[in-house]
Amino acid sequence: MRKAPLKSQSKKASQLRKTAKKSNTFEFGVFDLAIPPNITEPKNIKDVNTKWIPFGNDNLFPQYLAELKRKSSTQRSVLAQKTVFTSGAKFVCRDEGLRDFIKDVNSDKESLRDVFKKLADDYYTFGNAYMECVKYDGGVNLYHIDATTVRVAKSKKEIYVNSDWCKYWNQEDKMSRIPIYPRVAHNKFVIHFKDYEPTFNYYGLPDYVAALEHIAVDYEIGKWNHTKFLNGFQPSAIVEINGDMGEEEAQKMVTEAQKKFVGEGNNGKI
């Protein structure tokens, strides 16, 4: 069977295509390596019709990076190791009062290391990390904010937090605003940690941004091999039957053959 060339990104990976030939049935999957073509920030913020700066052309670049991390085992392993080595085992200090604080830094009973580890994970994954600080009488609580939910305001003075930018991208009532330090409002402020990146004034970029295609290929190779093992139709011989056969009969024959040759333990059988 002839292998089909890769199609454009307009086709989804799960789509199947059948040829119109009457006596033969061909099926193949199309892979979608949907790497963002350009990762830029708007040069003229006056042209941006929202109060925040979009991150990526579709404002979903952080979501893409998070999904890529879940799909590529190599990428996930590298980022996890960097996070573990950065966060260490624990924070230690001599001051007894400070020692008690770092064991419990917020109302969720998280330690300073718990929060710091999440910040390090976001920093390495997205090139950005956000820590929310909530002041109260006698101290301050520290919280990690999921970087995929945050967009920076045009003014650079606050952030917008949205649990679903894909669904509620234009509904401000679904968002919360938190000022960026040193501004404080309602006893809250956020500290934005980010990588420096030329031409980027609002967001940082992760170190691996130049390797996005290679990371995607790592995932696609694994998916290709897995699909091949499950659905590979490679008998050790080809049997040709002379005579006319209708489309329905041909399809039935293909189905019966696939039951025998497709699946675990059936490769190379005849």
Q: What is each of the regions a protein language model found here?
A:
Residues 2-270:
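Structured, contiguous alpha/beta core segments that scaffold functional sites
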